[in-house]
A protein has these predicted regions:
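Gly/Ser/Thr-rich phosphate-binding loop
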Residues: 150-155, 164-228, 241
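Conserved pre-ATP/AMP-binding loop-to-beta segment of ANL
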Residues: 45-67, 74, 97-103
Length: 401
């Protein structure tokens, strides 16, 4: 993965690695950071380097450390075991019905848990994985898709926005049989568009839900339910369990009642690492993950995400969902970008719309929609909404003012 020099330096200081796997053309500023002593071997277009640093003690089952999509710029890592990774790969292969005839193409970095899971689940079943370094906006990528008879495409919500602009639904791709989506909630209209197209053309469209802390998959929406349950994250993956709990930790059994989503399964990581000593720790989570997502379950057992637990604020005693506020604004002003942050009685809206008139229109619209005073909505212009490589908004970069 491409890592900023200051973060790389911090990671090296924190975790004291003995080996480094780096590209041949690593920037000079990065070379100065790496404590390189000798080259162990060259692999494709990369080098495996060894330093004299004595590495930290490792827990016997620790297999992999991955950054979470929400911790860009942070040394906090997820501690995954071999069992976590293998169990999740098996489960994904089961519900996607992956066989050795599948031909996926790499579209996401392997350092991203979604990208890793695609490789692992297909490799487990002996499928052929097409390696591509081309951006999906290039003609070279789509030529490769056609030439290699690629059978599945994957993407985060932003990818599907690009698919829509590129008119994927009008392309001649006879070998394409499966689409999968994860990495954030897909806007309802895109879910509907690709769901209808897949059903009408005999393809399968899987909307999925996961977090790096679960290696990463926890739920999927069966393709035959894609329209009936449009907007849903689906049901638990094979071998996993999902439930909702209230603020007191009691399980919620009534349908259409919002609570925190809790997952249990063998793919749940051992915990986080924030320093070298954490790498020697045993399993702290014991197969249970409190996702931090607020959701509801319908009477048929299908789950729907409504927002992040930390993305709710109180405004004059009313509970306001910041994620819902963003969705309302995106629907009302479809050509603009929005990000909402806030604290009690203050809701800040960052938008790519520039004029004061547009900002007044935003405040008035929210006041009418939420029945809250317009003065609680503070609207600010921003050139672009800050996003991480997974396409998720970096709220930590937005000031509450």
């Amino acid at each position: 993965a491409h890592i900023a020099p200051d973060l790389l330096q911090h990671l090296i200081k924190t975790y004291r690695p003995t080996f480094y796997y780096i590209p041949h053309d690593v920037p000079e500023e990065t070379k100065k950071i790496l404590p390189m002593n000798k080259t162990v071997t060259a692999i494709a277009d990369s080098l495996l380097l060894q330093s004299d640093t004595k590495g930290p003690e490792l827990f016997q089952d620790l297999a992999l450390l991955l950054t979470t999509s929400g911790s860009t710029g942070s040394p906090k890592l997820v501690r995954l075991t071999y069992r976590n990774i293998c169990e999740n790969a098996r489960s994904i292969a089961e519900y996607l019905h992956i066989t050795d005839k599948e031909r996926p193409i790499t579209m996401l970095p392997m350092s991203y848990s979604y990208g890793m899971s695609i490789i692992n689940s297909h490799a487990l079943m002996g499928a052929t994985i097409i390696l591509s370094g081309h951006d999906i906006l290039t003609a070279a990528f789509w030529e490769r898709v056609k030439r290699e008879n690629v059978s599945s495409l994957v993407g985060i919500p932003n990818t599907y926005q690009i698919f829509s602009r590129l008119r994927l639904t009008e392309m001649e791709l006879p070998a394409l049989k499966t689409l999968t989506q994860a990495g954030g909630k897909l806007p309802y209209e895109l879910h509907k568009k690709f769901g209808e197209w897949s059903l009408n053309t005999g393809r399968r469209f899987f909307v999925m839900y996961g977090q790096t802390e679960a290696a990463p998959r926890m739920a999927y929406l069966p393709p035959d339910k894609t329209m009936e349950k449009c907007g849903s994250m689906g049901i638990a993956i094979p071998g996993g369990e999902l439930k909702l709990i209230d603020e007191a930790g009691a399980e919620i059994t009534a349908p259409d009642t919002v609570g925190e989503l809790v997952y249990r399964g063998q793919n749940v990581a051992m915990g986080y690492a924030e320093c070298a000593a954490d790498l020697a720790k045993d399993d702290e989570w014991h197969g249970t993950l409190h996702t931090g997502d607020m959701a509801k379950r319908d009477s048929d057992g299908y789950f729907f995400i409504v927002g992040r637990k930390k993305r709710f604020i109180k405004v004059f005693g009313n509970r306001v969902n910041l994620d819902d506020t963003e969705r309302l604004l995106s629907a009302a002003f479809p050509d603009a970008g929005f990000a909402c942050v806030g604290q009690d009685d203050i809701l800040c809206v960052y938008t790519t719309l520039k004029t004061e008139e547009q900002h007044r229109a935003i405040s008035e619209y929210l006041a009418q929609t939420t029945r809250l005073p317009a003065k609680v909505f503070h609207v600010f212009f921003i050139e672009a909404i800050p996003k991480n490589p997974a396409g998720k908004t970096l709220y930590s970069q937005l000031e509450i003012r």
